[in-house]
A protein has these predicted regions:
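Protein kinase catalytic-loop region centered on the HRD/HxD motif
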Residues: 4-17
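Conserved protein kinase catalytic/activation segment
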Residues: 26-36
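Conserved activation segment of eukaryotic-like protein kinases, specifically the C-terminal portion
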Residues: 51-64
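Conserved catalytic-loop aspartate of Hanks-type protein kinases
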Residues: 76
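Conserved C-terminal C-lobe helix
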Residues: 106-121
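Walker A/P-loop phosphate-binding motif and the immediately C-terminal alpha-helix
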Residues: 150-178
Length: 178
């Protein structure tokens, strides 16, 4: 479903939209539906070339986002690969590229190939479009990914409206029940 959302953004006419900040905290899941939030780093493709700032989140942003290089849809493809990597490892990628990624033994070569191609340091080796990623993912079988990898990350954010209102106490109480 994430691929469908990004593909929709990339298909906008006359100018595709780049999301440029695909990371776990920007993906919400409710009732088996996926929502992409925080479009603060998003640009139309032609506007992304004239940006005055570096964009993205370390571990999820494509290497070209850390430089003032021209950006295209392949920057988001890198982010999709980083999410796929996070889903099976619970770890962020890094800027060293796909060669440095370590996978659990339960993950087969087919899934690894998809992630590594998405996260290639050189964008010329990445998938050209999101629909190709989606098709490759659909071709995976249950034996390609075992769901018993064992790491299930959980993030709970608490915000207080004033100092000393008990957020720390509530956070500790929640943590002790998990």
């Amino acid at each position: 479903k994430l691929c469908e959302i990004i593909s929709f953004l990339h298909s906008q006419k006359p100018t595709p939209i780049l999301f440029l900040d695909i990371q776990p905290k920007n993906i919400l899941i409710k009732d088996k539906r996926i929502y992409l939030v925080d479009f603060g780093n998003s640009f139309y493709v032609d506007e992304a070339q004239n940006r005055q700032m570096l964009l993205g989140t370390p571990g999820y942003a494509a290497p070209e986002q850390y430089k003032y290089e021209n950006l295209d849809e392949r920057a988001d493809i890198y982010g999709i690969g980083a999410i796929l990597y996070f889903m099976v490892t619970g770890r962020n990628g890094d800027c060293k590229g796909a060669r440095s990624l370590e996978f659990p033994n339960e993950i087969t070569g087919k899934y690894k190939m998809i992630v590594k191609q998405c996260m290639s340091k050189d964008r010329e080796y990445r998938f050209l479009d999101v629909s190709t990623i989606a098709n490759n993912l659909k071709d995976l079988t249950n034996t390609d990914i075992k769901y018993s990898v064992g790491y299930k990350p959980l993030t709970i954010s608490l915000v207080g409206t004033s100092p000393h209102c008990g957020v720390t106490t509530i956070g500790l109480a929640l943590a002790s029940t998990i």
